[in-house]
Amino acid sequence: MSRVAEEILRRARALGLKITCAESCTGGMISAALTDIAGSSAIFENGFVTYSNGAKQKMLGVSQKTLADYGAVSEAVAREMAEGALRQAQADLAISVSGIAGPGGSEFKPEGRVCFALACAQGTQSETQEFGALGRPAVRQAALDHALNLIRVHLNSAH
């Protein structure tokens, strides 16, 4: 994955963009993947690890109503997380991740469900991926890989 992270840094630097992220189930893995690369300070603004609902509200401005209506693992919350990170960090691009890494989950929100959002000045897009009950480490790795790929695709389609 470092190849993808390196590509992200190279492209963001060329475009003069700053990136931030808001992470729940990945617990800082996206931030770590980006900052593992020398020179990342030129494009990585900061990261937010908002594991609890309270942290999502306090640090990112996620609304209590959205959390109550949709639950933490939802595209609605992922969108508010990304938009809040973008606003708080004053960055150009924000990625957010909220999911159920496991073990656990329910019939309606199964283990392996991860919601993503990507926010920038042009708007916010979100999606849900069902990775399945792969086990906690594998779901978290799949979420990291998918998040980095979303950033890469977005940057490669810009300009």
Annotate each predicted stretch with a short phrase.
Residues 1-159:
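Short alpha-helical segments enriched in small residues
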